[in-house]
């Protein structure tokens, strides 16, 4: 599943992929197995980038626990927006991304006529959009709480329950459509 997700994320234009271990993760990789898996994913990144004509390769970070990764991040900058997918969120990722674009004075997403290669969120004044998606059973409440305490915004994808590989890619696509990189 992760192979497919990485391949499609590369095609969608992500710049960083951070494989995370959640309290609810089914697969637990560590040590040499984790290193081998990251090397495998790096080969997938190269192949996917070649396939879709990308000149910049996304970075694959080492596998790490969600809490460790969140704690290691610097505070959000003005040019960043961070979302955590949560079924308990009160508003959708699309609504939040569109509101961000509107605040920055960007035209509605359906009006965008972007040349190829525009960065996600470029019309909204943000140069970096982060999306945190949990495993099949979702992030643990403590993991979501940690993200929220660090400035992440909770977001829904809609009324459906999606598989993790689908949720991440739908989230990326929603951000691209709302912020002007797709369409």
Task: Cite the ranges covered by each PLM segment.
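Residue-level preference for the first positions of well-ordered beta-strands
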Residues: 81-82, 126-130
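Short amphipathic alpha-helical segments
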Residues: 31, 96-98, 143-145
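Structured adenosyl-cofactor binding patch, chiefly the S-adenosyl-L-methionine
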Residues: 140-183
